Amino acid sequence: MSRTVFCHYQQSDAEGLDFVPYPGELGQRIFAQIGKNAWQAWLAHQTMLINENRLSPRDPKHRAFLEAELQKFLFERNADKPEGYVAPVGD
């Protein structure tokens, strides 16, 4: 049986995540306040950020940048796309 949460990103009830997706207090907040669809939207946005900015998840500075963007994307709704980003045809 799935959990329902009030998704902060969607501002509506949504199916909750099955597990805590991120370590620490932020992970607990995501688990409690973010739905599956919003998390999938973040993963797509994160992939775009990694590719467009040539980020390495191993680099501590890049990880800090991604964490800040995660918070902006899910909780502030003001994450930006990289400068010069052009969406693929069909998006």
From Swiss-Prot:
Keywords: Iron. GO terms for biological process: cellular response to oxidative stress. It comes from the Bacteria. GO terms for cellular component: cytosol. Disulfide bonds: none annotated. One of its GO terms (molecular function) is iron ion binding. Belongs to the Fe(2+)-trafficking protein family. Could be a mediator in iron transactions between iron acquisition and iron-requiring processes, such as synthesis and/or repair of Fe-S clusters in biosynthetic enzymes. This is Probable Fe(2+)-trafficking protein. It comes from Xanthomonas axonopodis pv. citri (strain 306).
